[in-house]
From Swiss-Prot:
UniProt name for this protein: UPF0598 protein C8orf82 homolog
Domain of life: Eukaryota
GO terms for cellular component: mitochondrion
Lineage of the species this protein comes from: Eukaryota, Metazoa, Chordata, Craniata, Vertebrata
Protein family membership: Belongs to the UPF0598 family.
Annotated organism of origin: Mus musculus
Chain coiled-coil ranges: none
Length: 218
């Protein structure tokens, strides 16, 4: 079972839709019941992460700061075990899966499964980007040269753990702060060519672009 988050999830289940099988949006229409047991001693749960990096039960009627998961230990466990869903179940509608023993936790996302929410500064080491409410426990080195501003949807992306898709979305508030560091060339007024960071002028590599073939709507 998950770390002492049972009470957290139980509360979220109360706030979610009834436990009857329902249809959710996705590439295909699929029915499920939260906590269903397709096999003995196996449970399945279904989650959703929005563009702010907030995690919800997928069938929550209302998705806002009140209803999102906030338990740090739960979030760290959930996202540190996130992998592409190759289980043969719900792969099209829930492309990511977080396993905990015999518990399957399926995830779909508004944009990307990893959403960077905070830039953690430190006097002794390079800054790190924290994602999905995990603080220091869910953080990776900040690579300013690999920031990817996408003109198609006005969003900003950064490398993410490979197991979680390799590309993460930068939350809008943080993206706005970082945008002040961008330099735009005369030939490309909508897409920056360089970023100014810690006294350096750094060319943007744009190497993440091939990993985002279809930009989600703004």
């Amino acid at each position: 079972m998950w770390p002492p988050s049972g009470a957290v999830r139980n509360l979220a289940l109360v706030l979610a839709r009834s436990q009857r099988a329902r249809t959710c949006s996705g590439v295909e229409r699929v029915s499920y019941t939260q906590g269903q047991s397709p096999e003995p001693r196996t449970r399945e749960y279904f989650y959703y992460v929005d563009h702010q990096g907030q995690l919800f039960l997928d069938d929550s009627k209302m998705k806002n700061f009140i209803t999102c998961f906030k338990d740090l230990q739960f979030l760290v466990t959930f996202f540190s075990r996130l992998r592409p869903n190759h289980s043969g179940r719900y792969e099209a509608s829930f492309p990511f899966l977080s396993l905990c023993g015999r518990e399957r936790n399926f995830l779909r996302c508004e944009d990307r499964p990893v959403v960077f929410t905070h830039l953690l500064a430190s006097d002794s080491e390079s800054p790190r980007l924290s994602y999905c409410g995990g603080g220091e426990a869910l953080a990776i080195p900040f690579e300013p040269a690999r920031l990817l501003p996408l003109a198609a949807n006005g969003r900003l992306y950064h490398p993410a753990p490979e197991r979680a898709g390799g590309v993460g979305l930068v939350r809008s508030a943080l993206a706005f702060e970082l945008s002040a560091c961008f330099e735009y060339g005369p030939s490309s007024p909508t897409v920056p060519s360089h970023v100014h960071w810690q006294g350096r002028r750094i060319a943007l590599t744009m190497d993440l672009a091939p990993l985002l073939p279809a930009a989600p709507p703004p």
